[in-house]
Amino acid sequence: INTLIADISHQTKTPIANLLLYAQLLSEQDLPQDSRRCAAALEQQAEKLRFLVESLVKTSRLETGILEMHPKLSSLQPILEDAVSQVTPKAEAKGIALTMEPTGEGALCDPKWTAEALYNLLDNAVKYTPAGGKVAVRSKSYDFFCRIDVADTGTGIPEGEQAKIFQRFYRADSAYQEEGVGIGLYLSRQIAAGQGGYLKVSSAPGKGSTFSLFLPRR
């Protein structure tokens, strides 16, 4: 199955890139409103397909050990800043207050992969938080672990679905009104586990969610 995923990724990379390019070129033309909407929809779906293929490849490589992590003692501040900067435009577009508490904490982690895991958590938080809501990032150290929280004022997740949302392609009932492929949380948990950490959620319908990423300090 992993060989199949790799082959699919290789064969679809150029067609997807061409779709995105043509959609972007169309959107720059002086077209009727209906045609502009079609071009925007084409670009959105091509981007979604690109993200899905890339995510499948990443999870496949993580599961087989092909894509290795290189944990080292790292400052969390630049890692958090990297992840937050990537979702800031989306948050601003929805009028969501995105805040991050400065931290002097450090953890034994792979900075690149940790930023990827946090980006997935933040992207979901912004996606499922209504306009005008809040998303906050904060961290805290314990004796052996460092904890990074991504808290939102979004729709929340029923208790019966909280264990299922970390499964590949699973999407909670409340999530179907939003775009997504159901792989971000699975990938984030794989990244956490690959570094000797773990990921958990605390949530309730109508009360938002807090995803906590635990990473070893040494």
Kindly give the residue locations of the regions a language model identified.
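Short helix-loop "hinge" at the ATP-lid/N-box region of the Bergerat-fold HATPase_c
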Residues: 125-126
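Short alpha-helical segment of the dimerization/phosphotransfer core of two-component systems
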Residues: 44-49
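Conserved micro-motifs of the catalytic ATP-binding
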Residues: 64-69, 102, 106-109
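Short beta-strand/loop element within the Bergerat-fold HATPase_c
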Residues: 132-144
